[in-house]
Amino acid sequence: MNQPIHNAYWLTRFDSILDSALAQHRAISLIRVDLRFPEYMPATIMDTDLDSAVISRFFESLKAKIQAYQRKKRCANQRVHATSLGYLWCREFGKMYGRKHYHVILLLNKDTWCSLWDFTVSSSLATLIQEAWCSALRIEPWLGDGLVHFSRWTPSRKPTSPAAPPSSDDTPLPSGCSDTRKASDKKSGGSAVLWVTRGDKEAVQKALERARYLVKNETKLHDGSGQRNYGCSRGPGRLLDGR
């Protein structure tokens, strides 16, 4: 089977975003998340085929929620670690049903969030991401179950032995809370959160491998609609510190 053909331009853009994040922070948390649409959404709320601004609304909402989280900590006299929000996204369509969805990489200060926690904790990063996506979709948060999907990364390779578990590009983790589980409960492969420390070349290469999955040309739609298949943050980015 041929390897996916990657978009070199967007891979270079991601490399630049990663460099900017590491220039601002000693270490970052890289998070892979899939954003999906409800199977049925009344056109009076949003036409998912035409509304290309939904992904922009997601990032604006997430920034606002991070600021509110930081402000709450500051008001409680808790230590606040400022964070930028770097990101890369791609728009894809499922092979079987052709349903539109987004794959996203988020880059945040590791001192601010080193894990996702889970959806049962109102202040967790997982919850903030889900609420931001619901806000972008203009639906109530309680309707967001199953629409935000965090993934565990396993490099594409053949099993080293017949007993080895099969590999896949992205394998789901329940509740997106890989970093809060006991070691005995963890599956093989990398977690939903990748830590990248400044100067760690091996971790940088792992980050680029995750980005390559997003920038493959397969499953992208080129229909002349004018809607973008890719997007990313620009420059170093504003520090979100609750002020």
Task: List each language-model region with its residue ranges.
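Active-site-flanking beta-strand signature of metal-NTP-handling nucleotidyl enzymes
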Residues: I28-Y40
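Residues that flank catalytic or metal-binding motifs in active/ligand-binding sites
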Residues: S29, L85, K100, R210
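Histidine-centered divalent-metal-coordination microenvironment in nucleic-acid enzymes
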Residues: G86-W113
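Catalytic "initiation/cleavage/transfer" segments centered on a nucleophilic residue
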Residues: M1-H25, K110-R243
